[in-house]
């Protein structure tokens, strides 16, 4: 077996997602399983180079996980010819410039979304990457959730007949930070720092809708700030200038209507933190992070509206759980594996910087729709 060491500059791994999902659950998990077998006698061995601004935090991570390489100097890391891939999980406002430098240095790019703070910047990154001839990918983790993989299986199997509509509910109560610490970083709630639920979640909804149901043709959204003041990591009050909730209606190719509510100011009365209900002529499904329930046309009850008597049906009990039928790996790790196969075995991979730009576009148009109070068409973008 030929073991090939792959050095990956990982910028932003001291943050919640960068650390938990990308470093621990993806790259270190790949090392724990002995590397990634490409199937041709080559096993890829990922060697992370932890990059960030705070040396003490990087050192603590390296010691905790027995890793050798850390750096607070991105330029030096990018100048190192042994580093193949640049990964970015920084705050959005710092991402664009860093990715440009990495492309100029000839590194393959794998990045969190949103790829840039605006569509022009996102398209420029895609163009630069294409012209440089490098491989590039954008994290689209929701597609790899067990619940959505089951939903895709239902779609591919023709379960729904003609799909009519999609309803999504996402969110939970993020504490304000005064009497209980907030479970999300304070920059998420400051527009000037790249915060806001639209720029965070609409890129996710773009690829979920696009991949499963059809391209988004129009958006009509209301974005608002329900909680105008929050308290930061040091217990200091600050003005929440970014939107913390967004209510969107999306028209898709083929006439499917999607309606998705996203909120950090909602209390959860559903089985999971995100749920999508899909209704079709032949059946319906409700998919979350892990689970998926269905109701077929032949088993659909026939309720009659009568407010004078208690409900005779326990409606939730009339849905059937979709079995796993397979083992599901961590979604971030699954996508890392696909990207590494793309880079080193030329395997197909279409979640690239152009796909990332579509997500930025939808967020931008969603905010424009909210500001102008109107429905906005979503034009197709190309390089």
Over which residues does each language-model region extend?
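N-terminal Rossmann-like dinucleotide-binding module
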Residues: 1-65
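C-terminal capping/lid region of NAD(P)-dependent oxidoreductase domains
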Residues: 3, 134, 161-165, 368-383
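Short, conserved SAM-binding/catalytic segment
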Residues: 60-67, 124, 128-129
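Short acidic low-complexity segments
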Residues: 69-81
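Beta-strand-loop-alpha-helix segment that lines the small-molecule cofactor/substrate pocket
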Residues: 84-85, 91-92, 96-143, 158
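Predominantly a Rossmann-like dinucleotide-binding segment in NAD(P)-dependent oxidoreductases
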Residues: 142-240, 373
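Glycine-rich phosphate/pyrophosphate-binding beta-alpha loops
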Residues: 203, 262-269
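C-terminal glycine/acidic-rich active-site capping loop/insertion
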Residues: 231-234, 238-239, 247, 251-252, ...
């Amino acid at each position: 077996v030929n073991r090939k060491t792959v050095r990956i500059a990982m910028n932003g791994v001291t943050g919640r997602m960068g650390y938990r999902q990308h470093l621990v659950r993806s790259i270190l998990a790949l090392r724990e399983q002995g590397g990634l077998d490409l199937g041709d006698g080559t096993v890829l061995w990922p060697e992370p180079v932890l990059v960030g601004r705070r040396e003490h935090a990087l050192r603590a991570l390296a010691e905790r996980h027995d890793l050798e390489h850390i750096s607070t100097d991105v330029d030096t890391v990018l100048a190192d010819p042994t580093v193949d891939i640049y990964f970015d999980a920084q705050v959005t406002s710092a991402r664009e410039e860093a990715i440009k430098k990495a492309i100029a240095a000839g590194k393959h790019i794998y990045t969190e979304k949103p790829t840039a703070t605006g569509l022009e910047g996102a398209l420029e990154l895609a163009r630069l990457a294409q012209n440089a001839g490098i491989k590039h990918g954008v994290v689209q983790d929701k597609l790899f959730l067990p619940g959505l993989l089951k939903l895709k299986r239902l779609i591919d199997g023709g379960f729904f007949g003609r799909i009519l509509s999609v309803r999504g509910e996402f969110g939970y109560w993020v504490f304000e930070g005064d009497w209980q610490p907030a479970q999300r970083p304070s920059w998420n709630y400051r527009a000037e720092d790249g915060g806001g639920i639209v720029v965070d979640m609409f890129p996710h909804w773009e690829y979920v809708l696009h991949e499963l149901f059809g391209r988004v043709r129009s958006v009509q959204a209301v974005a608002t700030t329900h909680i105008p003041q929050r308290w930061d990591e040091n217990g200091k009050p600050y003005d929440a200038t970014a939107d913390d909730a967004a209510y969107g209606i999306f028209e898709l190719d083929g006439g499917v209507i999607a309606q998705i509510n996203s909120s950090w100011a909602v209390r959860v009365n559903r089985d999971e933190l995100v749920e999508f209900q899909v209704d079709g002529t032949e059946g319906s499904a409700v998919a979350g992070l892990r689970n998926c329930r269905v109701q077929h046309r032949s088993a659909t009850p026939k309720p009659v509206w009568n407010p004078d008597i208690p409900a005779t049906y326990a409606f939730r009990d009339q849905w059937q759980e979709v079995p796993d039928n397979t083992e599901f790996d961590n979604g971030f790790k699954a996508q890392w594996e696909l990207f590494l196969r793309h880079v080193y075995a030329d395997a197909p991979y279409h979640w690239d910087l152009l796909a990332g730009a579509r997500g930025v576009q939808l967020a931008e148009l969603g905010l424009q729709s909210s500001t102008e109070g109107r429905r906005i068409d979503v034009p197709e973008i190309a390089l």
